[in-house]
Every structure is written in C-alpha cells, then in structure tokens.
Amino acid sequence: MPRQLFVTTALPYANGNFHIGHIMEYIQADIWVRYQRMMGNAVHFVCADDCHGAPIMIAAEKVGKTPQQFVADIASGRKPYLDGFHIGFDNWHSTDGAENHELAQAIYRDLKAAGLISTRVIAQFFDTEKNMFLPDRFIKGECPKCGAKDQYGDNCEECGAVYSPTELKNPYSALSGVTPVLRDSEHYFFKLSDPRCVEFLEQWTTDTNPRGQSRLQAEVYNKIKEWLLPDAEGKRDLGDWDISRDAPYFGIEIPDAPGKYFYVWLDAPIGYLAALKNRFIKLAGDATTGAQHYDDFMADPATEQYHFIGKDIITFHTLFWPAMLHFSGRKTPNAVFVHGFLTVNSEKMSKSRGTGLDPLKYLSLGMNPEWLRYYLATKLTARNEDVEFSPEDFMARVNSDLVGKYINIASRAAGFIAKRFGGQLGVISDDGAALLKQIQIERTSIEQLYEAREFAKALRETMLLADRVNEYVDANKPWELAKQTGMETRLHDVCTVCIEAFRALTAYLKPVLPLLAAQVEVFLNIEPLSFASVSQTLGAVHRIGDYKHLMQRVDIKQLEALFEAQAPVEPDNIATESVAPGGEGMAPVISMDDFSKIDLRIAKIVNCETVSGSTKLLRLTLDVGETNTRNVFSGIASSYQPEQLIGKLTVMVANLAPRKMKFGISDGMVLAASHADEKAQPGIYILEPFAGAQPGMRVH
C-alpha cells in the first residue's frame, strides 16, 4: 500500500540569500523525495522562510524597511536557486503566515493546559547604549561548555551546547561592543525538566518508529544523550527552555501576555506544520476545507513525518521539538535525518565568514546543476559526516563516471540503432539477457540504499553496473560489427542491449538527475521511469527517437572561474587612461616579516576634542585595553565633529614611536582613508571595525 509522507528541510533564516549548505540539504531531501515518488508513495515536501527574531527586525530597520517588507524581498529571491538546481518543493511558506501564528499559539495553549509552562523573573542582558534587551544572537562571548570564543548567546557552533546567555563567559553586545548589564524581566518557560518530559525523551530518542527504524542516527543519539543521562549526583543538563522575548521584537505575541513574544526557535519548527497546512489550503481552494484536510492528514496514524537538518541544530529538533509536539497532543517525527557541513578543501562553508561556493555564480557560469546534484550525492551517506567538495574530484567524477561511463553507453549504441535499423530495437540474445538480468537483480539493493539515504553507495553500485555494460560493449565492439558482412543481427542485438541497459541505469539515477532522466524518457519514447520499470524491457518492436547529446563534460575553466575571488575585468577594445585606485599608485611590495612589525590594535575613542590653534587636528583619547589611555592627534577635523567620534571603535598603529608635536605628544596613529587629490574628492574617513571587536584586540 502506498505510503504518505510529510518531508521538510530546515527553515532558512530570512536575512540573506541561500548559500551552498542550504542547497546541499535541499538536494539531499529532494533526492529522497523523488525516490519515494518513484516507488509510488505520496509525499508532501515543504519548507518556509524563518522570518522572526530581533536580527531581522534590526536588519530591516537599518535599510529603512518594515520586517515584513524585508523578509518579502528575501523570499522573492529564492526561486532562481530552487528552480536552478531542480529542487521540487510542493510549497514554500513563511513563519509570519497566519497558519504559523494560529498553530504556535494553539500549541502554547495546549502546553500550558498540560502544566508545562511556567514564568519566572530572570536577569537578562541589556545594552545600555542601544537601550534594549539583547537577543541571544546579539550577545557573544565564550562558550560555558567548551570555551570556544565568539559564540552566540543561545548555542555554541563548535560543541553544539545550548545555554542561557547569562552563562556566557566575557559577554559583549554584538550591536555596540559594550559589556551588557543585567536587568530583571519576567520570562515564560517550557518545563523540559519536568519528569514527564524527561521520561518521554528518554524513550523517544531510543525508540524505533512504526516502520521499525531508529528515529535518530547513532551518532546523533550519542550527542544528545548527554542532556538526558544523569551525572554522579543524579542531575541532568536538560533544563527548562526559555521561550519568550521582550518587546521590541518581530514575532508572534504570546497569548494573554502583552509585550511578550515567542522566542524564534519556538515558532520556527512549527513553521513546518504551517507550511503543510498552507499547502492543503491551496490545494482545497479555501481555508476551512484545507484546514480540515490538514487535520485529517496529521491525525492519520499512517502519516510519516521526516525532517532533514544540519548537525548544528540537533538539540532543537531532537529534544525541544518532539517534546512540544507530544505534550501538545500532536504527532512526533518518525525520524530526524542529520547531515554534516559542506567543506571546500577541508574548510567549513560559512555564510557569516563570507566563504564558500556561490550557487548563483555556479549557475551563471553555465555549469550544469545536475553535475552538482550528482557530485553531492556521491558524497552523501546516512551519517552526519561532513561533505568534502574538491574541485579536482568534482571534475573527475562528472567527466569520468557520469559522462564517460553512463552517457557513453547511449552514445555508443543509439547512432547504429537510428541509422541501420530505423530506430527500432531488436531481439536480445542470451548473453545480453544475462547482462540485463544482472542490472535488474541489483534493483532491490539500490532501492534500499536510497531509502536509507545511502546515496553514495547507491551511485557506486549503479556505476559498477555501468562498468559491466561498457565491458560488454568493449568485448563486442559494435563499431567493428558494423563493418563486417553478415553481422547485422549481432550488431542490432548488442546495441539493443546497450539501450535497454541505459534505460535501467537511468531509472536508478533518476532521483539524482531528474532533468536528464526526463530527456532520456523523450529520447527513448517511454513513459516516466519508475524503479518497477527496471524489471521490464522495451521489446523488439519499440522505436526510440533520434539521439541528441545529453551532457557536456566539466570544463576546467569553469571551475577556475567558480573559485575566483573576483571575476577578472575584461579591458575595453578602446584604449582608456589608466587610473590609479584612490588617486595614487600602489606602494612597493613588502614581505610578511615587514608587515608583522606593525602592531594594529582596536581602540575605543573615549574622548575627542578640538585642538586650539589648529583647524586640521582633533585630540583623541584612546582606550587600547591597557591600564592607561593614550593621547593621539589626527588630522580629521575637516570631516568630523568631536561628539561624532566619542564611543566609536577604530584601528590604530599601537607600536609607532611617540611623536612630539607643537600641541603635545601623539602616542600612536589612528587609521583613516582619503583620496590623494583632496580638492577633487574631499573627505577623510576614519576606519571603524564591525560590532564585536573589543579595545586591545590585535588586527591580523
């Protein structure tokens, strides 16, 4: 009987474009969904933008937009990525949609009715410069568990720990750089420490789902069991979860609690349900009928629910989320599938650090999206291991395996079928039938590997089968048979076997290469392939279409362009005058040893005043993290009023010998930029580091 599945990927935060890590996760889930549909199962594949939280509110304010406008603009840019890489979500929604507001408040009420919501006054970090309570993501410091520096206020990207912002060591505001102060605020908590929650999670995390499969990968359970197992004193790390934030906040207001909003991590996973409900409403054409269909679907014991996520958000999805669902009377996930990070040459992909492979650049260079789908699939397993992208390996796998082994089968046979036999397939001899039988026998194994998300193994088995087909071609040499008198029947037989084998291999590759498979279906003049169709043959009366080249090889120049930091600027044909950047030529090259002699430090301008007798200079009092402040003169009076600079961070040369000037001693030099021709482009601009830098930090 066909299965009915509800499949999601992690919701991307709506503060920027997709990076390649998003695309990898979507491709992984998309392959699994396509496999399920080829098996005859019904799947609802949904996702949404994660729209709430102070970071989006603050980002929107900076660009003069409402949060709603800001996230709408982000959402409008999703389609080129999804379409470009053939990712077939059935619905893309928003956590700010009406369905999410309704579901979040309903789940909260159910948890409250179950006695699992409490309130208490907590000390919360407050930014005295910005006059606001700081969201977790705008507090940084050292992880209280592993000591990693520059970690966010709610969880550690290094060890995965989840904690309260007040547990951070050496905290600072990411908005202003100041050390925040503690102020009291009443907060709402989900009582995860309740014995009922602990007992449920101990069972759920070790249990099997109705299909007899583990809900969590072994390595994932080994990670989260640290929260559940008592220590020598009988204490657990699993504490109550703070689910509220204070206004101003862009989010969903907590019922009967004016000025209090749900923490974004409470309503974000509920966005999975909201996206599904919104899909049913769209399918039904009206809200009432669609809502009923959603309720019926989720109440059906046969419905299976699966989440694909990255290993950095395990805790939210394997502890908080199932407990919220269970104690609000809702279905819990059948399984949570966790993958690792994508790395390039062993370096972690990170949007915040500005590193990685740009998906849109990949597409704009004319690179085939199915190259990337195939390559990532050859790396993806059921474990949450990191996926390594090597440009050299990428080119070798596509050119050698995909084109050289698989595509080559059709190209070696289709021409003879068309020219010598009018496009009609022939009768298959015993040796050809034996080869096709070998391919058919592997069907169950390959199906099981796709089901288990062992895509790398499924493709490895498929390419081993392609090797056997190519060995058959090399042994029979159709190009020589075509030259020999009386060998027409054998030529027809061999080429027919190749086409039949190519068709079966295409079925095995279809979840990974959907567009190519569709082109093959047209070329072979067949109905859409399923795994069941592998067990059949087309027969001697079947006619195929004309062969057209199905896939190009990767060009090394494309890969080189993909990983260039900046595309080279092509010179115009018309001669132009060479213009030096900033109005002056670059200085002579120096060695790293020379540069390392300069000690650049972050400095805070604690005071600034004009200099009597000078129209150019300002006197800056700088905090460089030392016991005493420094006095520095800077020729920036034409661009700044003293009060504009007080409290700002800048960069200074800290080891410059003190210089005696007419107005006093200048103990260092602050860095500022200006054009060489002040008359043509007036203005001098002091350098200011990003939020998070602290006085005394060295600039490397």
Swiss-Prot record:
PANTHER family assigned to the protein according to its UniProt record, in alphabetical order: METHIONINE--TRNA LIGASE (PTHR45765), METHIONINE--TRNA LIGASE, CYTOPLASMIC (PTHR45765:SF1)
Gene behind the chain: metG
Pfam families: tRNA-synt_1g, tRNA_bind
Localization (cell): Cytoplasm
Enzyme Commission number(s): 6.1.1.10
Function, in words: Is required not only for elongation of protein synthesis but also for the initiation of all mRNA translation through initiator tRNA(fMet) aminoacylation.
Disulfide topology: none
SUPFAM superfamilies for the chain: Anticodon-binding domain of a subclass of class I aminoacyl-tRNA synthetases (SSF47323), Methionyl-tRNA synthetase (MetRS), Zn-domain (SSF57770), Nucleic acid-binding proteins (SSF50249), Nucleotidylyl transferase (SSF52374)
GO MF term set: ATP binding; metal ion binding; methionine-tRNA ligase activity; tRNA binding
Organism: Albidiferax ferrireducens (strain ATCC BAA-621 / DSM 15236 / T118) (Rhodoferax ferrireducens)
Protein name per Swiss-Prot or TrEMBL: Methionine--tRNA ligase
Organism placement in taxonomy: Bacteria, Pseudomonadati, Pseudomonadota, Betaproteobacteria, Burkholderiales
Entry's Gene Ontology BP terms: methionyl-tRNA aminoacylation
Cited NCBIfam families: metG, metG_C_term, PRK00133.1
Motif 'HIGH' region per UniProt: ranges: 12-22
Record's keyword annotation contains Translocase: no
